[in-house]
A protein has these predicted regions:
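ANL superfamily adenylate-forming
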Residues: 118-177, 282-335
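Structural core segment of the AMP-binding/adenylate-forming
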Residues: 56, 83-156, 542, 548-549
């Protein structure tokens, strides 16, 4: 597999097939049953769709948009586009219509692939603005203008392959490392999306370096549930396919829990929010059991934390702790592992800060959670923990082959083969994203994150540079760290820290209303209405006490003095979240400005 180091994403695919044509490369649900696809059949379908696109006139550097939920057709389309030397422009299936319109207007795609008629209806207002745009639905749609069926493209490509057997190899061999592979629009927590231009060499380098660094071996099983519109999941799929790991596509985020039990993955890429939900469910089950069950659960968590603190420093467990861990394993940890399929060897977490508590508990329970770090602009991974070197609280050590340094103001800077080519049609934004150096090759990309290295070379992220809160007393507060702590509460669904230029820090909190209603019933609170619950002083005091407990180790200036409870969850549709579920702080602060002001009236 490694005789020739692939330079493009197409070569990654071809090497994967050459290494095991008959192996089951992909699995997906069809009519409620798992269906497999061999590596050879995958390449055949990619070839047919690629040649079908070629027949339609798609050529090198043409841009092709994909607006679809993750699944095998997403990957086949992506590889087919790349095989032609064309450029994939993914659009999140949850992207607001006005942003879909913006992306289509700026990127000017030759074709738009869409998953379903429902998805087309959702963005119909945007599509009306582009009457000449040809649309390819994955599923047959009876009527509509400028529609080309996916099946017809694939069938036409198969005919062309039969007529000209060498054509696919000729076309795909003309794709080079420096060619543009994808324009990925970062959702951004403010302003319009920016199109990040990534080359084949950018993403190929990242996939190869990540696979080697993490020691991903053939024969593994992956469950894919994060959106392929995001470069993190997409790079992981390129990596897994190349290294002989079977990819299983979850039907949707709502089916992940059931899919895990059926697939029993050895590898997953995940986000902290999923781990937080699993952890909160564990806490709820233990609390509902009461008495001895709750005490055993709490004791087991303490054992997990102590075990992980030692094991991640490569220190042996003392005999007593080893015995305690074996007991806790039988009572609690085995059930937790079963909740994630029972075979997980590593979960790689990215996209947001991972609270140390979660990493310690899962790792101590035998589910190694490896936090990594990166951005769309860096293809995406910059650093990641490994099974052999997993320092909880850090995002790991840098990938081999790239450079990282910390600027004087604490900002993380990076350069190397992973760094993007610039923002599409935005030269000023591109220039602002890099340091000013005499030679372009010497420029450093400015990540916008604040961080530091420990003496052993592990990178720690403290916060987003633009998100740092400076209190009126001149103290800097990292909101994401505090939010991560608060989100561990079984009563908290979402939390946002506020307090810039204020005397103290406060928190806006969306409660977990299912758990809160159960607590309220036990306490004799005579309502289940959301707005009445958050107005009840007993509820406010209880959640504030839980926040105090979870943040007790913070410095005084970092501690939350007041909380404001919200009746509605932050959402993409509501405008408070990006498609990658990052909070748009400015939107939240504007929307709840009156409530925030009330948290600072009348003193502490």
């Amino acid at each position: 597999m490694e005789d020739h180091k692939p330079q493009t994403l197409v070569e990654l695919l071809k090497q994967a097939v050459a290494a095991g044509a008959d192996r089951e490369a992909l699995r997906f649900k069809q009519d409620k049953a798992w269906v497999g696809m061999t590596a050879e059949r995958l390449l055949e379908r990619v070839r047919n769709v690629a040649l079908g696109l070629y027949r339609l006139g798609i050529r090198k550097s043409d841009r092709i948009a994909i607006l679809a939920e993750s699944g095998p057709l997403w990957s086949i389309t992506d590889y087919a586009v790349l095989s032609n030397g064309a450029v994939s422009v993914p659009i999140y299936p949850t992207q607001p219509t006005h942003q879909v319109e913006y992306i289509l207007r700026e990127s000017e795609p030759r074709l738009l692939f869409v998953s379903t008629a429902r998805q087309m209806r959702r963005v119909n207002d945007a599509l009306k603005k582009f009457p000449d745009l040809r649309i390819v639905p994955f599923q047959p749609i009876a009527d509509g203008e400028n529609l080309i069926s996916f099946d017809s493209i694939e069938e036409e490509g198969a005919r062309l392959a039969a007529e000209q057997p060498e054509l696919y190899d000729a076309i795909s061999s003309d794709v080079h490392a420096g060619d543009l592979a994808s324009i990925i629009y970062t959702s951004g927590t403010s302003g319009e999306p920016k199109g990040v231009m990534l080359t084949h060499s950018n993403v190929t380098f990242n996939a190869l370096a990540s696979g080697t660094f993490l020691r991903i071996e053939p024969g593994g099983v992956m469950l894919s549930f994060l959106p392929l519109s995001h470069i993190f999941e997409r790079m992981v799929l390129y990596l897994c396919l190349h290294r002989g790991v079977q990819i299983n596509y979850a039907t949707g985020i709502e089916t992940v829990a059931a899919d895990i039990q059926e697939v029993r993955p050895t590898l997953m890429s995940t986000v902290p929010r999923l781990l937080e939900k699993i952890y909160a469910r564990m806490q709820k089950n233990a609390a509902d059991g009461g008495g001895m069950k709750k005490r055993i659960f709490d004791w087991s968590l303490r054992v997990a934390r102590r075990s992980a603190q030692l094991s991640t420093r490569n220190e042996s467990l003392p005999p007593l702790l080893q015995l305690q861990r074996e007991i806790a394993d039988q009572l609690v940890f085995a059930k937790l592992r079963q909740a994630v399929g029972g075979k997980i060897r590593r979960m790689v977490s990215g996209g947001a800060a991972l609270p140390s508590e979660l990493a310690l508990v899962f790792t101590g329970a035998g589910i190694p959670v490896l936090q990594g770090y990166g951005l769309t602009e860096t293809s995406p991974v910059i650093a990641v923990n490994t099974l052999e070197h997993n320092r909880v609280g850090s995002v790991g050590r840098p990938l081999p082959g790239l450079d990282i340094k910390i600027a004087e103001d604490g900002e993380i800077l990076t350069r190397g083969p992973h760094v993007f080519q610039g923002y599409f049609n935005k030269p000023e934004d591109t220039a602002a994203a890099f340091t000013d150096e005499p030679a372009e090759s010497q420029r450093w990309f400015k990540t916008g994150d604040i961080g530091l290295f420990d003496p052993d070379g592990f990178l720690f992220i403290t916060d987003r540079k633009k998100d740092l809160i400076k209190t009126s007393g001149g103290k800097y507060v990292a909101p994401q760290m505090i939010e991560g702590m608060i989100n561990q509460s079984e009563f908290v669904e979402q939390a946002v820290i506020v307090g810039d230029k204020r005397k103290y820090v406060s928190a806006l909190i969306v409660p977990d209303f299912e758990r809160l209603r159960a607590w309220a019933k036990e306490q004799g609170v005579g309502t289940t209405d959301k707005r009445e619950l958050i107005a009840d002083r007993r509820v406010v005091d209880m959640i504030k006490a839980d926040v105090n407990r979870l943040t007790r180790e913070l410095a005084d200036y970092e501690k939350v003095k007041r909380i404001g409870l919200l009746a509605e969850e932050f959402s993409i549709d509501g405008g408070e979240l990006t498609p990658t579920l990052k909070v748009k702080r400015r939107v939240v602060e504007e929307k709840y400005g009156e409530l925030i002001e009330s948290l600072y009236s009348g003193g502490e």
